[in-house]
Amino acid sequence: MSHSVKIYDTCIGCTQCVRACPTDVLEMIPWDGCKAKQIAPAPRTEDCVGCKRCESACPTDFLSVRVYLWHETTRSMGLAY
């Protein structure tokens, strides 16, 4: 099951989420849309196991990284049965 990993503009570029990910889903790339001028995108979300270690590792007050598990994503889109 694929999960959705969202990175928000509160990212400070500390790389804690990248280092916490056991499946190497995240990586830092340059980006002008966040405070740190870099962001951890999720190019391989199919490898995300939904452990949410990236969320736990994030030091910002408003989590900069958020994992939406498959069932959370479908429920929010009104697709759950």
From Swiss-Prot:
The entry's keywords: 4Fe-4S, Chloroplast, Electron transport, Iron, Iron-sulfur, Membrane, Metal-binding, Oxidoreductase, Photosynthesis, Photosystem I, Plastid, Repeat, Thylakoid, Transport
GO cellular component, one term: chloroplast thylakoid membrane
Binding annotation for [4Fe-4S] cluster 1: C11, C14, C17, C58
MF term (GO), any: 4 iron, 4 sulfur cluster binding
Catalysed transformations (reactions): reduced [plastocyanin] + hnu + oxidized [2Fe-2S]-[ferredoxin] = oxidized [plastocyanin] + reduced [2Fe-2S]-[ferredoxin]
Signal sequence annotation: none
Domain spans labelled 4Fe-4S ferredoxin-type: 2-31, 39-68
Enzyme class: oxidoreductase
Known EC number: 1.97.1.12
Binding site for [4Fe-4S] cluster 2: C21, C48, C51, C54
Localization per record: Plastid, Chloroplast thylakoid membrane
Listed GO biological process terms: photosynthetic electron transport in photosystem I
Lipid bilayer topology: Peripheral membrane protein
Cofactor(s) named in the record: [4Fe-4S] cluster
Subunit composition and interactions: The eukaryotic PSI reaction center is composed of at least 11 subunits.
Protein's job: Apoprotein for the two 4Fe-4S centers FA and FB of photosystem I (PSI); essential for photochemical activity. FB is the terminal electron acceptor of PSI, donating electrons to ferredoxin. The C-terminus interacts with PsaA/B/D and helps assemble the protein into the PSI complex. Required for binding of PsaD and PsaE to PSI. PSI is a plastocyanin-ferredoxin oxidoreductase, converting photonic excitation into a charge separation, which transfers an electron from the donor P700 chlorophyll pair to the spectroscopically characterized acceptors A0, A1, FX, FA and FB in turn.
Database matches in InterPro entries: 4Fe4S_Fe-S-bd, 4Fe4S_Fe_S_CS, PSI_iron-sulfur_center, PSI_PsaC
Primary localization: plastid
Protein name: Photosystem I iron-sulfur center
Cofactor note text: Binds 2 [4Fe-4S] clusters. Cluster 2 is most probably the spectroscopically characterized electron acceptor FA and cluster 1 is most probably FB.
